[in-house]
């Protein structure tokens, strides 16, 4: 028994060696055929002969110059295409089927199956060829005809009805070349040209590397077919075509699947990642994670001014405002910037066209998004709501400012004068100027000083701006923007277009309406007065109210020593009494005024 087993093992090993040797010879023969096919294709393209060297040589191929044989381009193109099909078959084991308009690649097993059942669809092939429908998802519902449907060169319309197809090309043998059955000669030669390397898509300047007929612009290849041979649960094979390289939105054809996916991104507007805190949606998970940091309590603190930021990148950008000197000033409004690029971006606001005007107030905007945000202030529409107290806001910036001022847990910076607390050091510094009277911002035109940069900008625009084109016919006051004029004219007409949805009270401006809703109709007012029991939304409002009971006047004027209960009263006093530059004087009595509107109001007394 042992001898028989040993002999059996020896025989098996011999068969295995013989099989390996046959495979090696077959592989060697395949490589030789590929080399021959490639050299023949080079000859057809260039008309020059190349002789392959043996392995002992330096490598490469010998160039045998010869006479260039002029042949018809169409014949050369056909033969080159067949050579390419043979090379593809040798490399991938796939057979190319070509119709008038489409190139489809099948594996050898699939091709054998189609050849074996050719009689099932031979009658359909004899019909007059019709044009292919654009590629779409095939939903053929009659399972009894699915096999025949699949074999009819995968052609169907959206309703599930079979489409008569043109004859398909038989696979050329690996060792020879036969004439192609489906050629472009059956179509007008001026409309169709086959080029195995490049094809110019209509509407573009550069050729696209696609192998196929240019008469019909939709291409199908191995990568275009999503699942064209997918058996279902019943074992019946259904065919489904998806043209992934043609965009359904703009009907654009792309050469690579990666280019198609990149091109499709702007068309995809689905935002499947939503924030559990505020409900805002995002298109990717990274954007959602960045957004969720704004809800977390952890903030990155600026050591200079105490301002907090959700991300380190925003903190780094903010730090540059402390480090850089602002050398670049705008010639229009005199605002200074630390970078030339920031100045250039700002100057666009003065020069760009603003074709979109608000129907309510006449203010113009450059983009539709800016107009939409502005119109919310006119209509009272509020999309952004606070998850803590439910308060709604017209813009996301207003919501963020509200959350930082009201709901932030830590307010480490407190005022020693009035006890008011702030979340940022910069706000504390700005607040303390109301007590000390420090005004670090001075106007270069008239020398007037201001406590904040926003007040200085407002002063320049109202007093020193030359290009004031909007004039009030009632009081003679000039305005830089039409929206400012419209808002000002309401003081003369008494118009109040903004009404409260709760009590119906009307207001002239949207800011007055918002202040009314916060003070009167908001449900949560945590700060109450111990004297009269009145409730307030903010601690600052409570402190200001308590001064009416105590008579405290912490804000005093450095010029005359007069005291005031609020900083607003102090500012109004300084402007009316101690302002040195009063440009507008009365011709009747010689009295001077700071603003033209005050002079016009004074003229009425004469």
UniProtKB/Swiss-Prot annotation:
GO terms for biological process: regulation of transcription by RNA polymerase II. Its main location: nucleus. Residues 1-31, 240-271 are annotated as: Disordered. One of its GO terms (cellular component) is nucleus. The keyword Secreted does not apply. The keyword Repeat applies. It is found in: Nucleus. Keywords: DNA-binding, Metal-binding, Nucleus, Repeat, Transcription, Transcription regulation, Zinc, Zinc-finger. Pfam families: zf-C2H2 (PF00096). Residues 242-262 have a biased composition (Basic and acidic residues). A zinc finger (C2H2-type) spans 273-295, 300-322, 328-350, 384-407, 413-435, 441-464, 470-492, 498-521, 527-549, 555-578, 584-606. One of its GO terms (molecular function) is zinc ion binding. It comes from the Eukaryota. SMART domains: ZnF_C2H2. May be involved in transcriptional regulation. Belongs to the krueppel C2H2-type zinc-finger protein family. This is Gastrula zinc finger protein XlCGF66.1. It comes from Xenopus laevis (African clawed frog). The lineage of its organism: Eukaryota, Metazoa, Chordata, Craniata, Vertebrata.
């Amino acid at each position: 028994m042992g001898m028989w087993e040993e002999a059996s093992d020896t025989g098996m090993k011999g068969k295995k060696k013989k099989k390996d040797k046959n495979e090696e010879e077959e592989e060697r023969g395949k490589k030789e055929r590929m080399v021959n096919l490639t050299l023949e294709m080079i000859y057809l393209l260039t008309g020059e002969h190349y002789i392959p060297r043996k392995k002992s040589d330096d490598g490469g191929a010998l160039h045998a110059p010869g006479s260039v044989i002029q042949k018809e381009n169409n014949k050369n193109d056909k033969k080159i295409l067949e050579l390419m099909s043979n090379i593809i078959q040798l490399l991938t084991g796939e057979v190319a089927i070509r119709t008038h308009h489409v190139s489809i690649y099948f594996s050898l097993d699939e091709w054998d199956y189609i050849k074996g059942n050719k009689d099932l669809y031979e009658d359909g092939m004899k019909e007059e060829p019709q044009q292919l429908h654009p590629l779409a998802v095939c939903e053929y519902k009659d399972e009894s005809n699915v096999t025949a449907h699949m074999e009819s060169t995968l052609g169907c319309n959206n309703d599930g009805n079979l489409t008569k197809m043109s004859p398909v090309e038989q696979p050329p043998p690996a060792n020879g070349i036969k004439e192609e059955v489906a050629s472009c000669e059956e179509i007008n030669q001026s409309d169709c040209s086959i080029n195995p390397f490049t094809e110019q898509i209509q509407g573009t300047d550069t050729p696209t590397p696609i192998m196929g007929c240019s008469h019909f612009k939709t291409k199908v290849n191995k990568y275009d077919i999503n699942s064209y041979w997918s058996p279902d649960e019943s074992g019946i094979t259904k065919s489904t075509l998806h043209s992934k390289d043609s965009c359904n939105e703009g009907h654009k054809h792309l050469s690579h699947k990666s280019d198609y996916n990149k091109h499709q991104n702007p068309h995809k507007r689905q935002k499947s990642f939503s924030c559990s805190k505020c409900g805002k949606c995002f298109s990717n998970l990274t954007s959602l994670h960045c957004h969720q940091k704004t809800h977390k309590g952890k903030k990155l603190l600026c050591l200079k001014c105490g301002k907090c930021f959700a991300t380190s990148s925003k903190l780094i950008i903010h730090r540059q405002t402390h480090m850089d000197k602002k050398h670049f000033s705008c010639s229009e409004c005199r605002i200074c910037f630390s970078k030339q690029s920031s100045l250039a971006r700002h100057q666009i606001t003065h020069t760009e066209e603003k074709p979109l005007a608000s129907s309510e107030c006449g203010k113009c905007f450059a983009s539709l998004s800016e107009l939409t945000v502005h119109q919310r202030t006119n209509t009272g529409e509020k999309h952004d709501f606070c998850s803590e107290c439910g308060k709604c806001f017209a813009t996301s910036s207003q919501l963020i400012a509200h959350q930082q001022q009201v709901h932030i847990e830590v307010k480490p910076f407190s005022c020693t004068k009035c006890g008011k607390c702030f979340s940022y050091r910069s706000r504390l510094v700005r607040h303390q100027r109301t007590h000390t009277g420090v005004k670090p911002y001075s106007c270069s035109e008239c020398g007037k000083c201001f406590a904040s940069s926003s007040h200085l900008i407002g002063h320049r625009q109202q007093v020193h701006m030359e290009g004031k084109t909007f004039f009030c016919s009632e009081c003679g006051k000039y305005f830089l923007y039409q929206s400012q004029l419209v808002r000002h004219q309401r003081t003369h007409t008494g118009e109040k277009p903004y009404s409260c949805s709760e009590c119906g009270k009307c207001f002239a401006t949207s800011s007055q309406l918002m202040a009314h809703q916060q003070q009167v109709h908001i449900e949560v007012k945590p700060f109450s007065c111990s004297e009269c029991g009145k409730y307030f939304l903010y601690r600052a409002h409570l402190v200001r109210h308590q001064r009416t009971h105590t008579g405290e006047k912490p804000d005093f004027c450095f010029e005359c020593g007069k005291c005031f209960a609020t900083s607003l009263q102090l500012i109004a006093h300084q402007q009316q009494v101690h302002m040195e530059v009063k440009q507008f004087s009365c011709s009747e009595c010689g009295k001077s005024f700071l603003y033209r509107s005050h002079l016009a109001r004074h003229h009425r007394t004469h």
